[in-house]
Amino acid sequence: MRDKVTGARRWVVKIGSALLTADGRGLDRNAMAVWVEQMVALHCAGIELVLVSSGAVAAGMSRLGWVSRPSAMHELQAAASVGQMGLVQAWESSFALHGLQTAQVLLTHDDLSDRKRYLNARSTLRTLVELGVVPVINENDTVVTDEIRFGDNDTLAALVANLVEADLLVILTDRDGMFDADPRNNPDAQLIYEARADDPQLDAVAGGSAGALGRGGMQTKLRAARLAARSGGHTVIVGGRIERVLDRLRAGERLGTLLTPDRSRKAARKQWLAGHLQMRGTLVLDDGAVKAVSQDHKSLLPVGVKAVQGSFRRGEMVVCVDQGGREVARGLVNYSALEAQKILGQPTDAIEALLGYVDGPELVHRDNLVLV
C-alpha cells in the first residue's frame, strides 16, 4: 500500500504546534529548516506541495511570555495575531534560502462551506501551486471564534486536501503514528502501520486529549483522515521528529500510520456530486455537447449550450439535459446563470470580451461533472 505514498503527486503537509514551537519554547527555526529542506526536495521531484502550519497561538504565547494557553477568547486572538507574523516570516525566509516563494493563506471553515468562496479558494491555491509557489495555510484564528475554541488544524488540513484534490495528506505530529494502545502507558504498544480510515476499531485506540499548546489530539487526526478519505484521499499520521521523515516517506519506507479510503478519489467525488447538492438550474445542450460530455468525457463548453434555465450562482449544481429534456449529467458551474446567458453558444475565446473576465474556459469542468 505504500505505493499510494510514493506515487502521490500532490501532498498536503500539516505540522502541529508542539513540533513548531519546541513544545512551547518559541518557534523552532532549526526544525523548520529541516522540514523545509525536505519539502524543497519534494518540490524538486515534481511533487506539488501545500503546507498547513499550526503554531500561531503557541508562537504568540512565547512572544508574549505566557506560560499556559489562555482560555479567554480575546487573549487567544491576541496571541494568534502576534504569533502569525513571526510564523509566516519564518517560513518565508526558510523557503527563500532554497529559491522558493511562499504565499500566506488564512482560511476559516466558513470559507470552505460557502461554495462560491470554496471555488475562489481552490482557484487561488491551484494557481499558486502551478506557479511553483508553496501556499502556507493557517486557520484565521484572529477573527474566528468558534474555530479557536472547537476547531483544529487537522480538520483544516483535511478540508484543504479535499479542496486541492491532494493525493496524500501527511500529518506530522509529536508521536510516531497511531498505536494499538497508549505508548505512554503501555510499553508493549504496537504501531499500526496501515488501516482503513473508516475502521471502527481505530476509535478505541485514538483516545486521549490534545496537548497544552494545540487543539488536536489523535482523535482529531483520525477524524481528519476520515474526512480526507471521503474524497478518496490517503493520510499518513507520522512523527515529525523522525529523521528525514518526508524523504523516507517519499522513498516508500513504512513510517507512521497510513489510513486509506474505501474508494478511489474519482468515485468518491462523483458520489458526492451525485447525491449531496440541490439542483439550482438547467443547461440545455446541443447534440455535439451531449456527445462530448457523455461519450468523450470532456468538459462542457459554452459553445455547446442552447439555453439556460433557473437562477444559480457560480459553484452551484445544475442539471444538463439534451434538447429533448433527457437528463445527461449534473455538475458544478463556473459561471452564474446571468453570466451563462451571456456566453451560451459562444466560443471559449469570446468569454473575456463578453464578461470582462474569465473564471475558466469551461462552463462546467469535467472534474465537476457526473453522468446520470
UniProtKB/Swiss-Prot annotation:
Residue spans crossing the bilayer: none
CDD domains in the record, alphabetically?
AAK_G5K_ProB, PUA_G5K
Cited SUPFAM superfamilies: Carbamate kinase-like (SSF53633), PUA domain-like (SSF88697)
Q: Which gene encodes it?
A: proB
Q: Which family does it belong to?
A: Belongs to the glutamate 5-kinase family.
In which pathway does this enzyme or protein participate? Amino-acid biosynthesis; L-proline biosynthesis; L-glutamate 5-semialdehyde from L-glutamate: step 1/2
Q: Which InterPro entries match?
A: AceGlu_kinase-like_sf, Asp/Glu/Uridylate_kinase, G5K_ProB, Glu/AcGlu_kinase, Glu_5kinase, Glu_5kinase/COase_Synthase, Glutamate_5-kinase_CS, PUA
Q: Which residues bind substrate?
A: S54, D141, N153
Per its record, how is this protein called by name?
Answer: Glutamate 5-kinase
Cellular location(s): Cytoplasm
What GO cellular component entries does it have? cytosol
Q: What does this protein do?
A: Catalyzes the transfer of a phosphate group to glutamate to form L-glutamate 5-phosphate.
Q: Which domain of life is it from?
A: Bacteria
Give the EC number(s) under which this enzyme is classified. Answer: 2.7.2.11
What Gene3D superfamilies is this protein classified in? Acetylglutamate kinase-like, PUA domain
Question: Its catalytic activity?
Answer: L-glutamate + ATP = L-glutamyl 5-phosphate + ADP
Specify the enzyme's EC class, one word. transferase
Domain PUA, by residue range, is: 280-358
Enumerate the Gene Ontology biological process terms.
L-proline biosynthetic process; proline biosynthetic process
Q: Enumerate the GO terms in the molecular function aspect.
A: ATP binding; glutamate 5-kinase activity; RNA binding
**What species is this protein from?**
Pseudomonas aeruginosa (strain ATCC 15692 / DSM 22644 / CIP 104116 / JCM 14847 / LMG 12228 / 1C / PRS 101 / PAO1)
